[in-house]
Amino acid sequence: MNVSLFVTCLADIFYPGVGKDTVEVLERHGCNVKFPENQICCGQPAFNSGYHEDTKKAAKHTIETFADADYVVLPSGSCAAMLLEYKELFADDPEWEKRAEELASKTYELTQFLVRVLKVEDIGAVCHKKATYHTSCHMSRLLRETEAPFSLLEQVKGLELAPLANKESCCGFGGTFSVKMPAISEQMVEEKVGHIEATGADLLIGADCGCLMNIGGRIERNGKTIEVKHIAQVLNSKE
């Protein structure tokens, strides 16, 4: 099965290991992974800031870049959700709206793809940790995906998963929200970290690098030792 990886900006710049683990997990489950080198940002920062014409430029580039892909897989619910938003951008342009719909029909967040398309029942990972999982907003609200990550984490040998209170609440990142509303964002992430600490977990897992960067930064600033990992890293773990 041919899969094209949309690595995302944050994974590419700050978490390259997430991209590597994503590729290895997909390959382990029979995928031939391609990486289009001319891929760029999905356009979400511009979209969230109201620059819709600039977003359209990024969207057209992405649509053309992945036009021949069988499947497009992203290690990010947020960026995957943005690709699904493209068709709304081109509601007044039938040609590009159709092309956007074609891209959306083959776009999946990583855990979605593993569960919904590949039907993985044994992820083949080992992680002897007590962990808790942060559910990101865009993945749960826009992609409407809440089950796939837990389905896969339950297959990880040695992993003890502790429930997180108020798991549906935002961590305060929200892309440009954390820049525009820093005081509110700080209060939100502080509350999130408090709930994480209350689980007694020594590992926080999430599916979006933006959330993990925000929460991980607060954990470090608070002097705590909770490890923070993207779910791709856990699904590729052997320890």
From Swiss-Prot:
InterPro entries in the record: Cys_rich_dom, LutA
Gene Ontology BP term (one): lactate metabolic process
Cellular-component GO terms for this entry: cytosol
Cysteines joined through disulfide linkages: none
UniProt cross-references to Pfam families, sorted A to Z: CCG
Any one GO molecular-function label of the UniProt entry: oxidoreductase activity
Summary of the function given for this chain in its UniProt record: Is involved in L-lactate degradation and allows cells to grow with lactate as the sole carbon source.
Cross-referenced PANTHER family: LACTATE UTILIZATION PROTEIN A, UNCHARACTERIZED PROTEIN YKGE
Protein family: Belongs to the LutA/YkgE family.
The name this protein goes by in its record: Lactate utilization protein A
Gene: lutA
